[in-house]
Amino acid sequence: SLFSLIKAGAKFLGKNLLKQGACYAACKASKQC
């Protein structure tokens, strides 16, 4: 259904944002941006 598709998309986007956030934080911490 459309709803489950939206939920799957939101979960995927959330994981990507978390990954990007973690990479950004590590980059800031090591000052290698």
From Swiss-Prot:
It is found in: Secreted. Disulfide bonds join 27-33. Its main location: secreted. Expressed by the skin glands. InterPro entries: Antimicrobial_frog_2. GO terms for biological process: defense response to bacterium. One of its GO terms (cellular component) is extracellular region. Keywords: Amphibian defense peptide, Antibiotic, Antimicrobial, Disulfide bond, Secreted. It holds the Pfam family Antimicrobial_2. Monomer. Has a non-hemolytic activity. Has a broad spectrum of activity against both Gram-positive and Gram-negative bacteria, fungi and protozoa. Belongs to the frog skin active peptide (FSAP) family. Brevinin subfamily. This is Gaegurin-1. The lineage of its organism: Eukaryota, Metazoa, Chordata, Craniata, Vertebrata.
